[in-house]
């Protein structure tokens, strides 16, 4: 039986209205068990200032972003279930949900799925990688009862 260990950190000044820990756990469990038996992930919910600072430091982009993924890379001789950290910006997730005409819950779920796939080594820099990752995200989201997260883009509602 697979196991997903979640360390949830709320660093947002307003914790009201955030998804519950069980929601984050469920979203991780929708992704990770198909890739490895035991997984440990830290999810840190932050405000725009921290997101902007981290995005600028690690990606050279001076603006907040929806999710940052920091994969853990253990030395080859050390086997640990730690996948890494997801840093998710509450305000950006809520703003994007409104812009993309999604429920906030749906977009939170998508950001957890998207970030988890980055922790597993998926990327979307090249078009072919993006297509593979987006197809996998869609499959996972639909398996959890959510709509295709890229439907708005496909329908021309967003960039």
From Swiss-Prot:
Q: Where in the cell is it found?
A: Cytoplasm
Q: Answer yes or no on keyword Hydrolase.
A: yes
Keyword Cytoplasm in annotation? yes
The UniProt record lists the EC number as: 3.1.-.-
Q: What is the predominant subcellular site recorded for this chain? A: cytoplasm
Tell me its cofactors.
Answer: Zn(2+)
User: Which Gene Ontology molecular-function terms are recorded?
Assistant: metalloendopeptidase activity; RNA endonuclease activity; zinc ion binding
Q: Which GO terms describe its cellular component?
A: cytoplasm
Q: Which residues bind Zn(2+)?
A: 114, 118, 124
Q: Which domain of life is it from?
A: Bacteria
A single GO BP annotation from the record? Answer: rRNA processing
- Give a single Pfam family match: YbeY
For this protein, what does the record note about how its cofactor is bound? Binds 1 zinc ion.
- Which keywords has UniProt assigned to this entry? Cytoplasm, Endonuclease, Hydrolase, Metal-binding, Nuclease, Ribosome biogenesis, rRNA processing, Zinc
**InterPro entries given in the database record:** MetalPrtase_cat_dom_sf_prd, YbeY, YbeY_CS
What family does the entry list?
A: Belongs to the endoribonuclease YbeY family.
Role according to the record: Single strand-specific metallo-endoribonuclease involved in late-stage 70S ribosome quality control and in maturation of the 3' terminus of the 16S rRNA.
Q: What is this protein called?
A: Endoribonuclease YbeY
Give the gene that encodes this protein: ybeY
């Amino acid at each position: 039986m697979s196991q997903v260990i979640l360390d949830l950190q709320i660093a947002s000044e307003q914790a009201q209205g955030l998804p519950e820990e069980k929601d984050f756990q469920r979203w991780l469990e929708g992704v990770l068990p198909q890739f490895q038996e035991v997984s440990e992930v830290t999810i840190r919910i932050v405000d725009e200032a921290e997101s902007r600072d981290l995005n600028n430091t690690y990606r050279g982009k001076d603006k907040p972003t929806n999710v940052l993924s920091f994969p853990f890379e253990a030395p080859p001789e050390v086997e640990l279930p730690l996948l890494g950290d997801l840093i998710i910006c509450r305000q950006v997730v809520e703003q994007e949900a409104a812009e993309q005409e999604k429920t906030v819950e749906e977009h939170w779920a998508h950001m957890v799925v998207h970030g988890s796939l980055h922790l597993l080594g998926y990327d979307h820099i090249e078009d072919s990688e993006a297509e593979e990752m987006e197809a996998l995200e869609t499959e996972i989201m639909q398996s959890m009862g959510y709509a295709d997260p890229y439907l708005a883009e496909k329908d021309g509602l967003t960039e």
